[in-house]
C-alpha cells in the first residue's frame, strides 16, 4: 500500500493575526527608528562614555576634596543672626539634644529644579550622629510617622500649593506630643534645636498663603493670613513651648528663601538663630561643627531680611499674585491651547501674562536704605523698634560672630580728593581679632552718589567693594584693600533726566561719600570710616569703559531695536514706576491685574516668516563650505596647536579657513541639536561633547553622572568669599570632566528681585556686585578646569510664577535693566572671561529674550564685545521660542530638546548662512577658549596634569541595536506575508482539486 503524502492545511486565522501583529510591530519600529534618528545627537551625548584620562583613584580623591569643600562653603555661608548670652557655641560636654520641628526629618540640601541636588547623603540628623551627638529619637520618630518626607519634592511636577506644603503637628496636640514624650524630652536634655524649613523651586514661586498639614493624613489647611515665608501658628506655638521649657534654644533656618523671623526676637527663651541655607548633598556635616564651635559661622546675609515682606517695593508685582493678564489676546501664545509641558498632566494656559518691575532700581537694601534716607519709615513703630529698626530685621551684609573684631581705616587718602573719570577710590582697613576665638570678618565699602529729586534715580547707598579676611587667630590682624572704580558708580540715564543733553552712563557733579560698613546700614565707628570725594563737573561715558564700544539706548522709545519700548511707554502699559522723588505717591501697592494688549505688542507674539525674510540683506556675501584645507582643531580628542591658537584669538585669520571646511549640514546640526552637548564636526576634527545641568551639582538634574552636591548659590553668596567660589567652580569643573562633560548649564545669576522668587536659592543675591563677584569667580574656576559655562538666565528670569513663567512679558526701565539685572552678566563678560550664556524663557518687553536683537547683539556683542556662544533655554515651547529668530538675533545654539527640529523659515539666503557660520564660530570659540584657559592655569601652577579634556566615546552601539530590531521586524513581517501567501496558494489548490474531483 502506497503511503499518501501529508496534506498541508491552510491556517488563515493564525496567519492573518500574525500579519496584523507584524504590521503593527513594523510600523512601531519604523516610527521609533525615525524618532531616534532625529534625536541621535542628544542620545549620543547622554549615553556616551566619558574619556578624560582620569584614574579611579583621582576621581575618588576629587570626591573627598569636593565633600570637604562643600562643608567649608556651608560653614562660611552659615549666618549667625542671634546669639543671646553667647549661647553658641554649645558646650563641648553638652552632646545630648532634642531636635524639634518636622523639618528636622526632611532636611533640605537644595531647592527643586535644575539647581537642586540629586539627593542628600548627609542630612542634619546624620551629621549629628557622625559628630557624636545623641538626639532624642522619640521626637524624630514621631515626626517621621506624622509625615514621612515631603509629598511633592519636585516643583516641576507639582503646583505651588503642593510643593510648598508646610507640615507641623501642633505642640498642644497630645495625639502627637504626648505628655510622656514631652517629659522624656526634658529629661533627655535641656537643649533644644528647632528646625524651620521652606522649599520653593523651579516653576513654583513661594506662595502668599500657607498650605498646611497639621494632622497625620489630614486635609490641607489653608491660612490666607500668612504667607509661606512666615512662621506657621504651629511653629510659633512650638517656639513658645521650647522657649519656656529649655535652658538653651537654637533655631536653624533651612530654607530656599528669605523669611519673616520677628518672633525669633520676641518669643522669650529663644537664644540663638543660624541661617544655615541649603547644605547640598554632604555639607550638613558642618552644621554641628558650627553649633559646637569647631567652625566659625562667618557668613553674612546676601539679602535684606525684613520683619514684614509686604514692605518690599517689589511685593505687589511678585509671585503668582503679581502676574497680570492681557485682555484681547485670544489665539496668542500661550493662550492658544498650548499645554504646559512642566506638569505630568496637560494643563492649558489660561492667559497671556505680564509682570511690571514697577519698583525700578529699588530692590532689596537699595529700597530699604533709600526709603530710610528719605524718612519713609519714620512713622513705623512696633515691638521691634521705631523707624528703620521696626522694618528691617537683618540688613543686607549682616552677620554675627563667635569672636569680636576691631577695624581701623589705615588708608583714607582719597578723603577730600577730586574724582577723575578713569580713576579709582581705594580704602585700606586693618581688621584685628579682639576676641578669644579664631574667626573671619567681612569688610564692606559703600558709596553714596549725589542725588537731585526728580532727576536720575539713585539708591542712597550701594555696595562698591568688599573683602573677607583670612581666619584670624586671637590678637591677629590683617589689612584688606577695597577699591571702587569711579566708572562703577555711573548711573544709566535713559531719559536725560538731568537735562544735560546726554543719555547713557554718567556721574553727576557733587560729593561722593564712601563709608566702611559692617552691613548696608551700620557704618563702622572709626573716625576715618567716612570718606568724601568731589566731582567738580559731571562725567559722561559714551563708550563702554572695558571695550571702548559705543553705548546708547537699546530698549527705550524710538531707540528700541526690538520695536517696542521696554518701559511700556509706546504700548499703553501705563506703568507708574517708583521714584525717590515721591516714594509715598508711587510705591506699588497693588499690581495691575488686567490690561489690553496693543497691536504693536501683538505683532511680536509669534515669530513669522515675514520677520525672517526681513533679516535678509542682499549685500551679504555667499559663504564657502566643504573646503579641503586640512585644518583640525582636535586630534583624537586632544586640542591641536591650531585649536589653542583659535581659542586664544577670536579674530585670528585662520578662523576663515577652518570655517570654510564645514558643511551646511554640520553647522545646522550643531545649532539645532545643542541639547546635552555639542555635535561632532568631522570636517574640522571636533569630537562630540557633553553638557550637563546643575548649578549646585554637575549632572544632578538629569542624574547622569552626578558630582558632589554643593550648597545652594545663595548659601555660597553668604560666604562673601570670592576665593571659595573660585575653588567651587574649579572643583565642579573637574568633576564635570571626570564624568565626561565639557560644558555646564550654570551657574545662574538672576537677581533676588523678591523674596518670593522660587529659584532664589539657585541665584546669589539681591545685589548686583555681590552676585557678579561670586558668580564670576565660579566661572573663572570652571574655566581653569577647562569647562565652559552657560551662565543663565539672560535675562530677568526673576520669577517662577508657575504656568505663567513661559513667555511672560516683563516691563521695566532701561536704567533698571542695565544697573540691576544686566550688571552681573556684564561683569562676567568683561571681568571674568565668561564665554557662554543661556537666554531665558521670558520676554524682555515684548520680545522673547532668546530672540531679542537688542539684548543678544545690541548690548551683549556690540557694547560688551562678547565673542562666545548664547544657547537658548530648553525649547519645549516652540511656538514662541523660535530657533530661526534666535539665530538671526544673535543666538548661537538651539536647545531643541528631544523633539529635534529644523529651521522653519527660509534657510537658503546668504544672510541665513552668514548667521549660521557666525553661530558656529561662536560655539567653537567657546569650546576652545576654556581649553586655552585650562592650559594657562596649569602652566601658572606648574602642574601639567591639570590639563584635561573630556570627550565622548561610544559605550553602546545603539544604532546597531536599532538596526538589528529593524531587521527582526522586517523578517517577521516577511514571514507573516509568506504565511498568508502560502495560505492563499493552499486554498486555491484545494479549490482546484475539489473542482477536478
Label every PLM stretch briefly.
Residues 1-501, 505-522, 555-997:
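Glycoside hydrolase catalytic-domain context in secreted enzymes
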Residues 523-551:
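Short beta-strand elements
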Amino acid at each position: 500500500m502506497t503511503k499518501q503524502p501529508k496534506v498541508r492545511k491552510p491556517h488563515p486565522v493564525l496567519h492573518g493575526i500574525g500579519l496584523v501583529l507584524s504590521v503593527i510591530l513594523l510600523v512601531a519600529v519604523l516610527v521609533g527608528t525615525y524618532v531616534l534618528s532625529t534625536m541621535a545627537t542628544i542620545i549620543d551625548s547622554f549615553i556616551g562614555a566619558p574619556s578624560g584620562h582620569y584614574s579611579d583613584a583621582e576621581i575618588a580623591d576629587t570626591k573627598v576634596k569636593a565633600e570637604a569643600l562643600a562643608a567649608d562653603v556651608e560653614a562660611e555661608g552659615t549666618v549667625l543672626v542671634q546669639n543671646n548670652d553667647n549661647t553658641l557655641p554649645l558646650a563641648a560636654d553638652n552632646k545630648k539634644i532634642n531636635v524639634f520641628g518636622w523639618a528636622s526629618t526632611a532636611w533640605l540640601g537644595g531647592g527643586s529644579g535644575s539647581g537642586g541636588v540629586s539627593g542628600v547623603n548627609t542630612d542634619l540628623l546624620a551629621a549629628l550622629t557622625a559628630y557624636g551627638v545623641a538626639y532624642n529619637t522619640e521626637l524624630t520618630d514621631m515626626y517621621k510617622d506624622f509625615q514621612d518626607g515631603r509629598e511633592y519634592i519636585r516643583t516641576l511636577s507639582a503646583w505651588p500649593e503642593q510643593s510648598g506644603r508646610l507640615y507641623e503637628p501642633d505642640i498642644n496636640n497630645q495625639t502627637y506630643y504626648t505628655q510622656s514624650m514631652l517629659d522624656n524630652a526634658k529629661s533627655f536634655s535641656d537643649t533644644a534645636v528647632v528646625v524651620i524649613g521652606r522649599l520653593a523651586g523651579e516653576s513654583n514661586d513661594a506662595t502668599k498663603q500657607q498650605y498646611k498639614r497639621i494632622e497625620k493624613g489630614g486635609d490641607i489647611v489653608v491660612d490666607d493670613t500668612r504667607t509661606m515665608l512666615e512662621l506657621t501658628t504651629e511653629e510659633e506655638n512650638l517656639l513658645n513651648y521650647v522657649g519656656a521649657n529649655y535652658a538653651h534654644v537654637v533655631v536653624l533656618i533651612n530654607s530656599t528663601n528669605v523669611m519673616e523671623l520677628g518672633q525669633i526676637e520676641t518669643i522669650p527663651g529663644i537664644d540663638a538663630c543660624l541661617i544655615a541655607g541649603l547644605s547640598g548633598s554632604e555639607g550638613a556635616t558642618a552644621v554641628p561643627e558650627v553649633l559646637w564651635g569647631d567652625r566659625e559661622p562667618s557668613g553674612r546675609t546676601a539679602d535684606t531680611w525684613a520683619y514684614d515682606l509686604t514692605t518690599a517695593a517689589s511685593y505687589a508685582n511678585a509671585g503668582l499674585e503679581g502676574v497680570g493678564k492681557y485682555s484681547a489676546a485670544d489665539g496668542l501664545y500661550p493662550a492658544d491651547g498650548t499645554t504646559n509641558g512642566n506638569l505630568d498632566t496637560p494643563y492649558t494656559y489660561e492667559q497671556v501674562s505680564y509682570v511690571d518691575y514697577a519698583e525700578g532700581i529699588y530692590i532689596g537694601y537699595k529700597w530699604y536704605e533709600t526709603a530710610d534716607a528719605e524718612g519713609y519709615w519714620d512713622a513705623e513703630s512696633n515691638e521691634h523698634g521705631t523707624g528703620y529698626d521696626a522694618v528691617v530685621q537683618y540688613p543686607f551684609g549682616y552677620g554675627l560672630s563667635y569672636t569680636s573684631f576691631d577695624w581701623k581705616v589705615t588708608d583714607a587718602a582719597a578723603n577730600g580728593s577730586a574724582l577723575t573719570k578713569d580713576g579709582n577710590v581705594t580704602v585700606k582697613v586693618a581688621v584685628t581679632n579682639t576676641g578669644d576665638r579664631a574667626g573671619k570678618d567681612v569688610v564692606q565699602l559703600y558709596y553714596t552718589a549725589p542725588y537731585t529729586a526728580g532727576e536720575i534715580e539713585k539708591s542712597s547707598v550701594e555696595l562698591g567693594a568688599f573683602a573677607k579676611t583670612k581666619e584670624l587667630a586671637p590678637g591677629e590682624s590683617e589689612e584688606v584693600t577695597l577699591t571702587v572704580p569711579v566708572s562703577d558708580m555711573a548711573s544709566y540715564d535713559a531719559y536725560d533726566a538731568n537735562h544735560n543733553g546726554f543719555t547713557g552712563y554718567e556721574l553727576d557733579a557733587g560729593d561722593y561719600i564712601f563709608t566702611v560698613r559692617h552691613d548696608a546700614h551700620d557704618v563702622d565707628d572709626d573716625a576715618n570710616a567716612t570718606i568724601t570725594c568731589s566731582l567738580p563737573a559731571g562725567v559722561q561715558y559714551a563708550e563702554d569703559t572695558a571695550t571702548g564700544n559705543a553705548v546708547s539706548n537699546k530698549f527705550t522709545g524710538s531707540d528700541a531695536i526690538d520695536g517696542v519700548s521696554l518701559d511700556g511707554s509706546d504700548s499703553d502699559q501705563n506703568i507708574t514706576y517708583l521714584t525717590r522723588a515721591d516714594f509715598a505717591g508711587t510705591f506699588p501697592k497693588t499690581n495691575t491685574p488686567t490690561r489690553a494688549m496693543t497691536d504693536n505688542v501683538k505683532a511680536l507674539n509669534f515669530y513669522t516668516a515675514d520677520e525672517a525674510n526681513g533679516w535678509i540683506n542682499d549685500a551679504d556675501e555667499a559663504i564657502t563650505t566643504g573646503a579641503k584645507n586640512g585644518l583640525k582643531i582636535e586630534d583624537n580628542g586632544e586640542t591641536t596647536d591650531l585649536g589653542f591658537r583659535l581659542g586664544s584669538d577670536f579674530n585670528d585669520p585662520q578662523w576663515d579657513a577652518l570655517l570654510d571646511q564645514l558643511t551646511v549640514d554640520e553647522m545646522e546640526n550643531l545649532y539645532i541639536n545643542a541639547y546635552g552637548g555639542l555635535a561632532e564636526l568631522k570636517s574640522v576634527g571636533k569630537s562630540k561633547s557633553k553638557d550637563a545641568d546643575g548649578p549646585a551639582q554637575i549632572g544632578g538634574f538629569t542624574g547622569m553622572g552626578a558630582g558632589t552636591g554643593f550648597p545652594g548659590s545663595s548659601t555660597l553668596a553668604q560666604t562673601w568669599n570670592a576665593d571659595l567660589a573660585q575653588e567651587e567652580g574649579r572643583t565642579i569643573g573637574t568633576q564635570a570632566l571626570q564624568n565626561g562633560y565639557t560644558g555646564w548649564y550654570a551657574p545662574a545669576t538672576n537677581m533676588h528681585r523678591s523674596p518670593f522668587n522660587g529659584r532664589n536659592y539657585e541665584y546669589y543675591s539681591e545685589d548686583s556686585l555681590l552676585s557678579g563677584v561670586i558668580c564670576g569667580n565660579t566661572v573663572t574656576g570652571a574655566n581653569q578646569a577647562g569647562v565652559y559655562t552657560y551662565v543663565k538666565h539672560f535675562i530677568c528670569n526673576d520669577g517662577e510664577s508657575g504656568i505663567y513663567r513661559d513667555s511672560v512679558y516683563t516691563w521695566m526701565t532701561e536704567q533698571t535693566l542695565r544697573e540691576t539685572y544686566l550688571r552681573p552678566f556684564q561683569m562676567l563678560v568683561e571681568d571674568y572671561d565668561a564665554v557662554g550664556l543661556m537666554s531665558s524663557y521670558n520676554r524682555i518687553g515684548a520680545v522673547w529674550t532668546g530672540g531679542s536683537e537688542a539684548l543678544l547683539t545690541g548690548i551683549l556683542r556690540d557694547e560688551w564685545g562678547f565673542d562666545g556662544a548664547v544657547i537658548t533655554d530648553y525649547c519645549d515651547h516652540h511656538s514662541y521660542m523660535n530657533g530661526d529668530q534666535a539665530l538671526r538675533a544673535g543666538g548661537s545654539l538651539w536647545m531643541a530638546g528631544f523633539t529635534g527640529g529644523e529651521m522653519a523659515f527660509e534657510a537658503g539666503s546668504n544672510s541665513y548662512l552668514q548667521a549660521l557660520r557666525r553661530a558656529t564660530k561662536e560655539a567653537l570659540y567657546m569650546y576652545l577658549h576654556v581649553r586655552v584657559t585650562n592650559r594657562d592655569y596649569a602652566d601658572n601652577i606648574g602642574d601639567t596634569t591639570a590639563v584635561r579634556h573630556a570627550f565622548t566615546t561610544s559605550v553602546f552601539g545603539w544604532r546597531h541595536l536599532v538596526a538589528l530590531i529593524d531587521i527582526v521586524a522586517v523578517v517577521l513581517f516577511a514571514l507573516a506575508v509568506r504565511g498568508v501567501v502560502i495560505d492563499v496558494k493552499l486554498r486555491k489548490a484545494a479549490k482546484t482539486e475539489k473542482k477536478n474531483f
